[in-house]
């Protein structure tokens, strides 16, 4: 596709208007695919390919030629620099469900970008599926609530549900109002483990029958 780009920072806010003073409606993660709707000075209006979400991000840090082969399976993965054959941690991370390309690897580390390495145990093949939903949701225990957030630095309730599906390469809407329309309604008496439950302004997951 001609208008087909991939985000190349660990994450950034998606704003409703081209200013950091406007509302944050969501975030975009490393390796996430999007198209550019328009450009405005230092900003671009984008539409994410996964869920058709629109908003503004800064006009930097994206690429065209990118074929993700793996994804981050840890809540956040420490980034390392390789100096004289030693791996030195730096104060940067890449977050759960981010898509990456494997450039080089050794027994314990993989290089996903030039001179940026992460631990091999922190990634899975891009086609890996985690059927145990509770395993993913437990990763985010004690994560603070953040409107528009999509990572362990802060996440909102609808993003928490969506991130499970995104990790598993399955579609699910970003916002609660759209999630309600997308889901099949069931009786309260029929709640089972794994059911998605909506109430005023929020969404959650049923852990037990």
Cite the ranges covered by each PLM segment.
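...with weaker cross-activation on analogous glycine-rich loops/strands in unrelated enzymes
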Residues: 170-209
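Residues located in well-ordered beta-strands
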Residues: 10-13, 32-35, 205
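Active-site nucleophilic cysteine motif
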Residues: 137, 149-168
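Surface-exposed patches in mature extracellular/periplasmic domains of secreted proteins
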Residues: 145-149, 174-175
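Generic N-terminal amphipathic/basic segments
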Residues: 1-12
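Short, structured beta-strand/loop micro-motifs enriched in basic residues and often containing a Trp
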Residues: 10-19, 73-86, 175-185
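A structural connector/turn signal
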Residues: 23, 89, 185-189
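Boundary regions of SH3-family modules and the immediately adjacent low-complexity/disordered segments
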Residues: 1-3, 19, 26, 30-35, ...
């Amino acid at each position: 596709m001609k208008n087909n780009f991939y985000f190349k920072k660990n994450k950034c806010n998606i704003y409703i208007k081209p200013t950091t003073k406007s509302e944050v409606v969501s975030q975009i993660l490393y390796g996430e695919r999007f198209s550019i709707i328009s450009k405005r000075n230092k900003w671009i209006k984008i539409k994410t390919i996964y869920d058709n979400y629109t908003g503004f991000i800064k006009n930097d840090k994206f690429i065209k030629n990118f074929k993700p082969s793996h994804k981050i399976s840890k809540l956040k993965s420490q980034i390392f620099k390789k100096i004289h054959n030693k791996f030195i941690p730096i104060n940067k991370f890449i977050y759960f469900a981010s898509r990456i390309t494997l450039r080089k690897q050794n027994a314990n580390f993989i290089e996903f970008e030039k001179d940026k390495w992460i631990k091999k145990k922190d990634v899975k093949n891009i086609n890996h599926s985690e059927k145990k939903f509770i395993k993913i949701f437990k990763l985010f225990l004690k994560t603070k609530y953040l409107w528009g957030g999509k990572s362990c630095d802060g996440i909102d309730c609808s993003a928490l549900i969506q991130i499970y599906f995104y990790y598993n390469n399955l579609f699910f809407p970003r916002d609660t109002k759209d999630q309600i329309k997308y889901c099949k309604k069931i009786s309260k008496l029929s709640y089972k483990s794994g059911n998605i439950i909506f109430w005023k302004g929020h969404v959650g997951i049923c852990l037990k029958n």
